[in-house]
């Protein structure tokens, strides 16, 4: 998820109808392009440009994207009587954009308040003026033009009652970081046994007559969702957007709603009374003694649901979850005033711990992962490529070192320590929307967590200071070492690959540790020392039990009865749902349903070989998980995680 949108709709909506037609979108695009070219946009660093996807996670190399098969409504089977999210159905969605330039148009309007209209045909029925935008953050920025990006479809964009099977918003997800496509479906299947969670199945998407292959079709958290689970469309909803430096901790920040509004995005009416009740929840959670917490909190929070929520996150290792990032989840306050904490994006599940917010994984993050290489490589290319040929020569790379050092050494002292370097590095690697804290300031931008590792790498004499000659020497050495083709220059992929090997994992740090007396240290949140590694899938079920920055875990698990109940849920999930005898047949059925389409998919982010292996074999890379350039087989994860949890001393009780 991205942060606050860039608002341009009102500025270019000349006829005041609340949306932009083609004639209005043209100047809006030109405006955004100029803003971003001048550095006035809000994206900081953008997606990969040009043809080609992220290159996979270190398994079989992804082929360059190319046009898919031509398909029309008469070429596929219709399912007019099947529910929209029927998991046995592979339904086809035909999108017709007004322009063949639709990819660039969606990219121009990414993270703005503008929808691009399409004609949508499903099961032989046509829906007009459906609004479409690219969704996601890492799943967008790590994917180049021509490869599959996630889509959000608003059926009610222009016609308020328009829906498919009672659903007004669709999310077509690109299976970023998941070569199997199965992870969201499996996680949500299990989650719905414990708490309100989205429905999901697979969809075949055809755009302007060309197949774009298989997407995960995941239900939107909106009024339709609330109606299904709670029997009403009333109540308040919040989205805690995905952010590697997530601040959606449910900590008490005082009584002023302004302190919360930059973190928790309210999706319903911005009512002061609603905010007051939310702030009360945070205050009670954080400031009530453990022996009084359950009684005080029960009227405000579905405590049992919260325990199930954190148990699912941990047992199934959700690398986008509250336990690691304190973001990318949803909150609902029902009509009785009680709050419910619900899952958000779950594509990075059934994996080894890693990714933004964690110290595990590979070195600097796989070339296609959302890590320092993906952040740095586009900036290096855009800032150093003076002749605009999409390559960096050794001379250009060396000149870039001079430009960077001039910016970093503002005081002209001739050298920088790590603190000075990191502080100024934010000017070289600006924060995109969603990274900075509310109220401005650099805060937790990419420069903050990439800077220390970058400094350590280019400080070649390891004396704790960086000189111009050291920076130039490092860049010139990289230019030679990473030029695998001996062409005299580096393209962006070479930069990413080289940076992935050269840089250490980012430092997120912070208070942490497992719970219990004498417990060892666990993964840490933003703000402190480097986090320890976790062996394989051995993520402690009591991780963050002593972390004050994760009160939904630490405060609830400080109550012995709640701790025991939580561990009971962990035990049940491991014993029942991670048993491959139960999980395997479901995964195999899903795999078989989409296998032929995935093989034929010319826009997918991973190879067919990785798709086939991912069910029962590890896909090897420089490491495992989103930052490590590999992917763990689903069966391997289930077997190993189940064995570890069922043998964990407090889970066995």
Where are each of the predicted segments found?
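Acidic carboxylate motifs that coordinate Ca2+ or other divalent cations, activating on Asp/Glu
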Residues: 13-17, 21, 320, 385-391, ...
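Phosphate/dinucleotide-binding and metal-coordinating scaffold of catalytic cores
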Residues: 1-8, 26-383, 393-395, 399-407, ...
């Amino acid at each position: 998820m991205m942060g606050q949108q860039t608002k341009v709709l009102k500025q270019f909506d000349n006829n005041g109808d609340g949306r932009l037609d083609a004639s209005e979108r043209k100047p809006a695009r030109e405006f955004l392009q100029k803003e971003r070219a001048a550095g006035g946009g809000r994206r900081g660093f953008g997606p990969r440009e040009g043809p080609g996807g992220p290159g996979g996670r270190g398994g079989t190399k992804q082929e360059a994207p190319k046009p898919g098969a031509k398909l029309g409504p008469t070429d596929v089977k219709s399912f007019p009587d099947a529910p929209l999210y029927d998991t046995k159905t592979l339904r086809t969605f035909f999108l017709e954009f007004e322009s063949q330039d639709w990819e660039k148009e969606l990219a121009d309007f990414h993270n703005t308040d503008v929808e691009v209209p399409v004609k949508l045909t499903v099961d032989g029925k046509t829906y007009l003026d459906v609004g479409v935008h690219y969704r996601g953050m890492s799943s967008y920025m790590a994917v180049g033009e021509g490869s599959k990006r996630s889509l959000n479809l608003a059926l009610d964009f222009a016609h308020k009652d328009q829906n498919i099977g009672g659903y007004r918003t669709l999310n077509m997800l690109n299976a970023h970081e998941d070569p199997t496509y199965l992870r969201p479906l499996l996680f949500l299947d299990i989650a719905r046994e414990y708490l309100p969670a989205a429905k999901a199945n697979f969809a075949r998407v055809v755009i302007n007559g060309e197949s774009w292959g298989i997407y995960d079709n995941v239900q939107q958290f909106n009024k339709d969702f609330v109606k299904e689970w709670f029997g009403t469309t009333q109540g308040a909803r919040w989205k805690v957007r995905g952010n590697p430096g997530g601040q959606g901790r449910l900590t008490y920040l005082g009584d002023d709603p302004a302190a919360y509004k930059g973190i928790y995005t309210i999706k319903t009416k911005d009512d002061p009374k609603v905010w007051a009740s939310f702030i009360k929840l945070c205050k009670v959670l954080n400031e009530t003694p453990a022996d009084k917490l359950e009684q005080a909190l029960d009227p405000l929070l579905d405590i049992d649901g919260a325990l199930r929520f954190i148990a699912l996150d941990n047992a199934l290792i959700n690398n986008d979850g509250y336990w690691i990032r304190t973001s990318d989840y949803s909150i609902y306050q029902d009509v009785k005033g009680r709050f419910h904490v619900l899952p958000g994006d779950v594509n990075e599940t059934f994996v080894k711990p890693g990714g933004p917010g964690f110290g595990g994984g590979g070195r600097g993050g796989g070339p296609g992962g959302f890590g320092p290489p993906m952040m740095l490589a586009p900036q290096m290319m855009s800032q150093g490529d003076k002749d605009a040929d999409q390559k960096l020569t050794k001379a250009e790379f060396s000149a870039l070192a001079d430009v960077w050092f001039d910016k970093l050494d503002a005081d002209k002292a001739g050298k920088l320590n790590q603190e000075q370097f990191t502080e100024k590095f934010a000017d070289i690697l600006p924060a995109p929307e969603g990274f900075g804290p509310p109220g401005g300031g650099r805060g937790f931008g990419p420069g903050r967590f990439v800077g220390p590792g970058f400094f350590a790498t280019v400080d070649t004499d390891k004396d704790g200071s960086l000189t111009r000659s050291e920076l130039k020497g490092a860049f010139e050495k990289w230019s030679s070492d990473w030029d695998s083709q001996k062409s005299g220059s580096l393209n962006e992929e070479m930069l990413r690959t080289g940076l992935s090997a050269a840089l250490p994992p980012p430092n997120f740090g912070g208070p942490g540790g497992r719970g219990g007396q004498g417990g060892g240290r666990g993964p840490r949140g933003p703000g402190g020392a480097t986090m320890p590694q976790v062996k394989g899938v051995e993520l402690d079920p009591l991780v963050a039990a002593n972390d004050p920055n994760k009160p939904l875990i630490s405060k609830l698990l400080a109550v012995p009865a709640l701790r025991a109940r939580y561990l009971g849920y962990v035990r049940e999930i491991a014993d029942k749902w991670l048993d491959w005898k139960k999980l395997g047949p479901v995964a195999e059925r899903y795999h078989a349903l989409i296998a032929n389409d995935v093989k034929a998919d010319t826009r997918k982010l991973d190879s067919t070989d990785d798709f086939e292996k991912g069910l029962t074999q590890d896909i090897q890379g420089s490491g495992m998980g989103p930052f490590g350039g590999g992917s763990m087989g689903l069966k391997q994860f289930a077997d190993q995680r189940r064995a570890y949890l069922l043998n964990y001393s407090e889970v066995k009780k």
